Each structure stands twice: as structure tokens, then as C-alpha cells.
């Protein structure tokens, strides 16, 4: 249910953009995002920090987009958020020697430190790629092409990155079905 709720504002944004325009789509995105947070709080009693940050960014940049009737503000959001994710992952790994991916998934997975570092770095690179592709598309293609990319391209890229991560993680999983921590390679 939570994952489905994450896509509803994006789907509504896409449909509204195709039927109306950027201002209407931005307003629908902001309202749907606020409702999403309210529903999550009501149904689950809490909203994750990352979701609050993302919702705040959507509301801020969505309102700017609606007010000025200019999509570039939502385009900036994608660039800024992906850039921030990459920076946070890289600073945590190289400055603080703590791969954040391990903090997120470490309770579910037992991996060697090298694997956590590789995953963390890989996701940082992924966010940099998303940021750069977003910049390229927003500056060199039509507004409609950017909306299509935002609605489907980033999701496709995320699915591919997740599959690559899964394949990478698989090599470190225990082969006998046990949950031991001695799967070092």
C-alpha cells in the first residue's frame, strides 16, 4: 500500500499535465502529495523522514511552478534532490566512513563492508546520472518530453539500478539458506 501511495501523486501529475497544463498539474501534484502524507500519518502513525523531505520539496517547488506557471521549478527539484542524495551518500562514505545504504538495509542484509561501500557508491553514481540526465532533458528537449522522463524515465532507471543492486547483493547471500555473517568474499 505504501509503495502504491508513492506513485499516486506522480500519476495524477502526469494525467493532469496531459489534460490541462503545467499550472494545473503542479497544483494537483501539491494537493496529492499533502494528502499522501496525511494518509500515511493516519494509516501508519508515522511518516519517514525521507518522505517528509521529499514532500516538502514537492510542495515548495510545485507551488513555485503553479504560481509562475513555469515548469523549470519542478525541473530544478529533480536536479537538486538527486544531487543532494548523491552528496549525502558520498560524504557519509568518504568523510564519515559510514555507507548510508548499510544504515538503511543493514538490519535485513549481512554483507561485507566492501559490498556496502560498493552499493553506497553505486547509488551515489546513480543519483548523479539521474541529475545529469534531468539537466540534459530539461534544457535540450521539450517540456512534454521532460514530463514523460520525470513520470516514467526515472522510474525505469530506478528499477534498473535496483535490479543491478540485487544481482550484486546476491553474490554475498548465504548459499545454504542460513543467515550467517561469514559470507565475506
Curated annotation (Swiss-Prot):
Give the protein's recorded name: Inner membrane-spanning protein YciB
Q: Which residues form a coiled coil?
A: none
Q: Keyword check for Lipid metabolism, yes or no.
A: no
Name the UniProt key words of this record, in alphabetical order: Cell inner membrane, Cell membrane, Membrane, Transmembrane, Transmembrane helix
Instruction: Please indicate which superkingdom the organism of origin belongs to.
Output: Bacteria
- Secretion signal span: none
Entry annotated with the keyword DNA-binding: no
- All disulfide bonds of the chain are none
Q: Which organism is it from?
A: Haemophilus influenzae (strain PittEE)
What family classification does the UniProt entry report for this protein? Belongs to the YciB family.
* UniProt topology in membrane: Multi-pass membrane protein
Q: List the subcellular locations.
A: Cell inner membrane
Which InterPro entries does this chain map to? YciB
Q: Name one GO cellular component term.
A: plasma membrane
Transmembrane spans:
19-39, 53-73, 76-96, 118-138, 149-169
Quick one: which gene encodes this? yciB
Describe the task this protein carries out.
Plays a role in cell envelope biogenesis, maintenance of cell envelope integrity and membrane homeostasis.
